[in-house]
Amino acid sequence: MIFMKEIVAIIRPEKLEEVKNALEAAGCHGMTVTEVRGRGRQLGITESYRGRDYRIDLLPKTKIEIVVNDEDVDTVVETIVKSAQTGDIGDGKIFISGVDEVVRIRTGESGKKAV
């Protein structure tokens, strides 16, 4: 039985500090953050530079990965939504999937104790 979930949030880079601070205030301290590029419905943007238009198809985003116990999923998701939301296209997505096992390398602990 799976008791843990991985939450992957793709957010605007400028919202990272706000999201990180909100997660820490909610008691979620462990996370992995990666700078990524992507697009969804936003389909990129067009910018002008020196009189020429340039299409940017893949926009800079920030990916946050967090593994939590099942009982913490709703709190973490709500915290991310509230702190990352601008109401505009391009705010991002949150993906939630099951985690079969977690092992803390330092101690060898596994399961909920390792989260």
Curated annotation (Swiss-Prot):
The keyword Glycoprotein does not apply. Pfam families: P-II. InterPro entries: N-reg_PII, N-reg_PII-like_a/b, N-reg_PII/ATP_PRibTrfase_C, N-reg_PII_CS. One of its GO terms (cellular component) is cytosol. One of its GO terms (biological process) is regulation of nitrogen utilization. PROSITE patterns: PII_GLNB_CTER (PS00638), PII_GLNB_DOM (PS51343). Keywords: Nitrogen fixation, Nucleotide-binding, Phosphoprotein, Transcription, Transcription regulation. It comes from the Archaea. GO terms for molecular function: ATP binding; enzyme regulator activity. The modification O-UMP-tyrosine is found at Y54. PANTHER family: NITROGEN REGULATORY PROTEIN P-II, NITROGEN REGULATORY PROTEIN P-II HOMOLOG. Could be involved in the regulation of nitrogen fixation. Belongs to the P(II) protein family. This is Nitrogen regulatory protein P-II 2. It comes from Methanothermobacter thermautotrophicus (strain ATCC 29096 / DSM 1053 / JCM 10044 / NBRC 100330 / Delta H). The lineage of its organism: Archaea, Methanobacteriati, Methanobacteriota, Methanomada group, Methanobacteria.
